[in-house]
């Protein structure tokens, strides 16, 4: 058969390439995966009316009052919350869709009691999907769901609540929180597919999956929260809207939640695939559309979470099979999809995460078929493929990890130019593999940061980039995130091998004294100085040289937020150097007024036990000896027992008698 060429070959290659739709949300909302239009049932109703001027002003004032939180007692605050909830009755939907009043609703949910929580939950019945799609109301739903999960666990552990059967006035009877939650799930089930890539509802869906699968419910303000968007986390910090103790926890859930999760994901799979059964032949169009979800910036985190939890009840990993093949053969369309994942920021983040919790045999297949032959090339893609390679180093078996290390080590010094995290990952992989090629790793790192041929080598300059940093600035610039990353990396190098500790100290001693002292006052670089003060790893000569510099500014260091930690560390660092310890103590006592007037200085004064230095010097010296012996146990000189003493005395007496006889002769 002749070799294919020309336009037919070009068309075939083009058909096999993966090109995600730019407007995938629009397409997925209007069409099923089999290409047929779907009924328009997922368009949310998000207008529920507006508050009148007086109501709006009242709720604004109550939001400000709760925000200030100046209540004298908890009872007073609880009564205030009760009054506001009563005033808000019947207006809940108007409140949650208002920018200002939605914050009030979140504060009410965070501060209400269990009965009030159920009442608020019931107020949204029939509209959970609608408000989940709203910019402001979706945040209220997330807060409500977290508190509801806490109450579900509470009722599960303590099944009977005499005071939970009715409301305070006896007008309402509430079902268990579990039933209310399941009722809410039935309401949103028909809309699951449209929620996957909805800008706001996707966050609610992820939280629901986390609750049903008993995973950690994330904080809404932490930077690494997996539910809230970056803008939302920043906004909550700015308006001082804090989580309560129900967040950032794992909750025990009833068996019905696991069953509901299974049913929900099965329904979603059926909806996505045109009612195909698991492991059945899937339409290629369905697979392409699902892969578009995998690289969609909104839908991708939802798909990642689904792939993570499906293993709880589905051994066949149906959703994984929608994204990837499971046979050992290379597939042209899958290869195009993998190349897109490895070169796209969203796609690489998706692949990086699913590698960490997918079945090992599935990850090994992807590595063997598509990644193994291009490890170095992918590692040089700083914002995409590099993160996938790092994830493989953390999660693959020993054999594959060693293969990756063998491929990367010759180019490590080049990779570190643009991706310092690679150094950390390789160090950790080396340690995990019983110090595999440790000497080569050290050699490559030294070549990068402390080259032998350089006359001006200084690991502080090469690793921390001191010359272009905020060190010594008089503008009160905050340390940058890049400086923080570099400092942490240098500390990891110091922990990895004594060579890096030695060159770090050597580099500090080669700096101008003023420059080294500036590091001690820096919010980030001070941690590096503190980290080298490891008494058992630094020889006594280097310790003395460092102490000679630090003692010159010891009083100011003790009164500084960052320098005080260094002074505290000097207590141990001066072990077996009592003279230096006494010089530091004398300098601090001589400037006692300045030290005691500083909150940091007072802590140093306490840690150095300077009151005993002044009043009971002998006891202070005794503490020094005990501390030195604890740091260097081999210093202890064992006292001879009684028999040994007698033997020594007899030996000495015999020597004295022999010498006396000789003198007489």
UniProtKB/Swiss-Prot annotation:
Residues 1-42 are annotated as: Disordered. Gene3D superfamilies: Leucine-rich Repeat Variant. Pfam families: PUF_NOP9. Residues 12-28 have a biased composition (Basic and acidic residues). One of its GO terms (biological process) is regulation of primary metabolic process. It is found in: Nucleus, Nucleolus. InterPro entries: ARM-like (IPR011989), ARM-type_fold (IPR016024), NOP9 (IPR040000), PUM-HD (IPR033133), Pumilio_RNA-bd_rpt (IPR001313). Residues 1-11 have a biased composition (Basic residues). Keywords: Nucleus, Repeat, Ribosome biogenesis, rRNA processing. Disulfide bonds: none annotated. Belongs to the NOP9 family. This is Nucleolar protein 9. It comes from Candida glabrata (strain ATCC 2001 / BCRC 20586 / JCM 3761 / NBRC 0622 / NRRL Y-65 / CBS 138) (Yeast).
């Amino acid at each position: 058969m002749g070799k294919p060429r020309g336009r037919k070959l070009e068309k075939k290659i083009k058909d096999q390439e993966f090109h995600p739709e730019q407007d995938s949300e629009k397409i997925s909302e209007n069409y099923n995966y089999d290409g047929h239009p779907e009924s328009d049932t997922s368009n949310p109703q998000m207008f529920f009316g507006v508050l009148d001027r007086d109501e709006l002003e009242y709720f604004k004032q109550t939001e400000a009052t709760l925000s200030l939180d100046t209540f004298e007692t908890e009872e007073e605050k609880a009564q205030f919350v009760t009054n506001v909830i009563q005033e808000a009755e019947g207006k809940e939907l108007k409140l949650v869709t208002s920018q200002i009043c939605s914050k009030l609703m979140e504060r009410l949910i965070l501060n209400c009691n269990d009965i009030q929580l159920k009442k608020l939950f019931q107020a949204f019945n029939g509209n959970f999907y609608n408000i989940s799609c709203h910019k402001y109301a979706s945040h209220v739903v997330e807060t409500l769901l977290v508190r509801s999960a806490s109450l579900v666990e509470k009722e599960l552990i303590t099944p009977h609540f005499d005071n939970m059967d009715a409301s305070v006035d006896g007008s309402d009877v509430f079902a268990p929180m579990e039933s209310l939650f399941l009722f809410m799930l039935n309401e949103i089930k028909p809309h699951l597919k449209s929620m996957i890539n909805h800008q706001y509802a996707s966050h609610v869906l992820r939280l629901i999956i986390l609750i049903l699968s008993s995973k950690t419910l994330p904080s809404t303000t932490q930077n690494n929260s997996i539910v809230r968007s970056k803008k939302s986390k920043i906004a909550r910090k700015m308006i001082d809207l804090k989580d309560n103790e129900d967040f950032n926890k794992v909750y025990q859930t009833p068996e019905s939640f696991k069953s509901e999760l299974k049913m929900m994901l099965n329904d979603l799979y059926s909806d996505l695939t045109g009612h195909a059964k698991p492991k059945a032949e899937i339409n290629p169009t369905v697979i392409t559309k699902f892969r578009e979800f995998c690289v969609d910036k909104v839908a991708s985190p939802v798909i990642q979470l689904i792939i993570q939890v499906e293993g709880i009840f589905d051994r066949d990993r149906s959703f994984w099979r929608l994204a990837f093949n499971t046979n050992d053969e290379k597939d042209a369309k899958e290869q195009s999809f993998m190349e897109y994942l490895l070169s796209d920021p969203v796609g690489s983040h998706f692949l990086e995460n699913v590698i960490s919790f997918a079945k090992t045999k599935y990850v090994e297949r992807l590595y063997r078929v598509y990644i193994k032959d291009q490890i170095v090339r992918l590692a040089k893609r700083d914002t995409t493929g590099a993160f996938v390679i790092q994830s493989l180093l953390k999660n693959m078996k020993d054999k594959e990890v060693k293969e990756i290390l063998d491929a990367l080590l010759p180019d490590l010094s080049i990779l570190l130019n643009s991706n310092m995290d690679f150094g950390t990952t390789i160090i950790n992989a080396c340690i995990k593999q019983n110090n595999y090629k440790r000497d080569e790793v050290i050699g490559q790192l030294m070549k990068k940061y402390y080259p032998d041929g350089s006359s001006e080598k200084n690991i502080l300059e090469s690793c921390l980039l001191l010359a272009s940093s905020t060190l010594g600035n008089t503008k009160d610039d905050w340390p940058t995130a890049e400086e923080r990353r570099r400092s942490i990396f240098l500390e990891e190098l110091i922990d990895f091998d004594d060579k890096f500790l030695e060159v770090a100290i050597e580099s500090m001693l080669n700096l101008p004294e003023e420059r080294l002292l500036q590091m001690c006052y820096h919010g980030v670089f001070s941690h590096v100085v503190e980290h080298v003060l490891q008494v058992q790893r630094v020889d006594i000569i280097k310790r003395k040289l460092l102490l000679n510099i630090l003692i010159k500014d010891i009083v100011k260091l003790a009164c500084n937020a960052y320098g005080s930690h260094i002074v505290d560390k000097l207590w141990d660092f001066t072990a077996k150097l009592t003279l230096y310890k006494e010089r530091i103590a004398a300098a601090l006592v001589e400037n006692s007024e300045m030290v005691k007037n500083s909150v940091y200085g007072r802590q140093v004064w306490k840690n150095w036990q300077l009151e005993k230095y002044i009043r009971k010097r002998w006891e202070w010296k005794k503490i020094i000896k005990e501390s030195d012996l604890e740091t260097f146990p081999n210093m202890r000189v064992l006292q001879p027992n009684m028999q040994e003493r007698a033997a020594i005395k007899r030996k000495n007496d015999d020597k004295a008698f022999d010498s006396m006889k000789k003198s007489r002769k």
